[in-house]
Amino acid sequence: MAYGILLLLLGGLLLANICMGSVTIPLEGIFRFIKGEALSQVETNILFQIRLPRALSAAILGGALGLSGYLLQTFFHNPIAGPFVLGISSGAKLTVALVMVFLLGQAVKVSSAALILSAFFGAFLSMGFVLLMAKAVDKMSMLIVSGVMIGYICSAITDFVVTFAEDSDIVNLHGWSQGSFSGMSWSNVQVAAIVVGIAA
């Protein structure tokens, strides 16, 4: 029953995301399109080039984020374990900040894949430190404390690194840390679906 309600909510949110925007696509127009009737060229472009890729990316990656949190809580037997509490997110942001400030600052071209790999490396490294600290005291209850400590250390180093950054790099880092689904394409949806499918 609960899963059915969640699926209905997800479907409703997807429809709202598709219909609402600077150009409104009426809900009846979506249903007519499903039945085989054609939309206008503008509505078709907005639907298939902008809103559908964005909505599907949000659904796939949002589900992956929820699943990762559930797996962390299950693995560590702690209901409050998560990427923010364990310092994983802070470690990822630190390495991305280093790449943006010191590589982009030197006019080195950095691809999205490089930022993703650097974030993964930082998350993996910070999680390793947390596990080592928790193992040293031999108490899983110290895992959360260790994660919070690592998170604050990474955040402090990130703030220090940002002081050397150009204004444009600070804006880029802030935009990356906040996250956005604008500009998502069908190729991004395919990559996200493949990666999440393999990881799951």
Give the residues covered by each predicted segment.
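Alpha-helical transmembrane segments in inner-membrane proteins
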Residues: M1-A200
